[in-house]
Amino acid sequence: MSQTKICALFMFNHRFERNLPMIERLYGNRFSHRHILMPFATNPGPNISRVYELGRNFSGHIAQAARDFIREDFTHYVVIPDDLLLNPDINEKNIIERLNLREGEGYINNLIAADALRYSWPWAGEAAGTFGRSAQAIDLKGLLPPAEEAKVRFENMGIVFPSSPGPANFFKRIAAQPKAARTRWAYLYTLSLLGRKSPYPLLAGYSDFLVIPAPAIDRFAHYCGVMAALNIFAEIAVPTALALSTDRLKTELELNWHFVGSAAPRADPTGLKGVAFWKEEDFRPYAELLARPLDEMIATFPEDVLYLHPVKLSNYA
């Protein structure tokens, strides 16, 4: 692969400006080109973009800030949330090699048809309904590829779309969400779709760590903006936008698996693994590591782990 030039995009979902010195401390010597995307930033500047979306719609952050960070000399853009701790051995010189990415290849944790998750993950059904409703207010012609064209593109990547989204233990899942009113509402909204397919072939994927090759960045930012305008949840908006804009896409998990749960097989069992703390049992093996002082924690970071997420960097300030 030819010489790379990386732009690291640090994504904030909230105005946590007190974390900026920690970002500099952790990554200043590892990535020469850093850009901050922060909602309502107090002091925007050449390397800090002030953006205006809710965290659940962070695809809009990318679209709003694109003109600030896109440069012709960059070969890749790496998205790193402010609460994600990237393996300290990874830097701008080795990240593409460590991820074993081919020329022009992007990276995301996983990809699955959102309709396949319609009755097991609340935001899949919500996104299907929201897309149809929001699309009535936006003329999407020329803004997104036609639905059938996008579906064929995704199927050529290996994505499998269900013939008819159907419920499985649906009401038990709703009952298991007694305190999450928005989640219960999303499930009930899903039920109102009566098994109809999404009007657009949306994908779902864990979107907190991404690599976007430069040839795709303009299209990716544009599609992210369209999805934000449609009010599509980020972990559906971003993977859909990335798969629409990138011809080759590598995933950590096998295609057609969701990121929640430990049963999903990894596409490359010998590659680096991302660790997300969804439940207490996910966090427990790393509790001692994260309780150490920052320098000691960095020195003993597991070699086979790509990142830990989420991690409160303010704990190490």
Tell where the protein language model's regions lie, with residue ranges.
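Conserved catalytic core of nucleotide-sugar-dependent glycosyltransferases
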Residues: 85-226, 231
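Short, well-formed alpha-helical segments that are part of the catalytic scaffolds
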Residues: 15-29
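Gly/Ser/Thr-rich loops at beta-strand to alpha-helix junctions
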Residues: 14-16, 80-86, 242
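Short loop->beta transition adjacent to catalytic acidic/histidine clusters or analogous donor-positioning motifs
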Residues: 2-7, 27-36, 48, 75
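C-terminal catalytic/acceptor-binding lobe
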Residues: 165-317
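N-proximal low-complexity "stem/linker" segments adjacent to membrane-targeting elements
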Residues: 1-18
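Active-site-proximal specificity loops/subdomain of glycosyltransferases
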Residues: 37-103, 111, 115-124
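Structural alpha-beta junctions
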Residues: 27-38, 72, 98-112, 228-229, ...
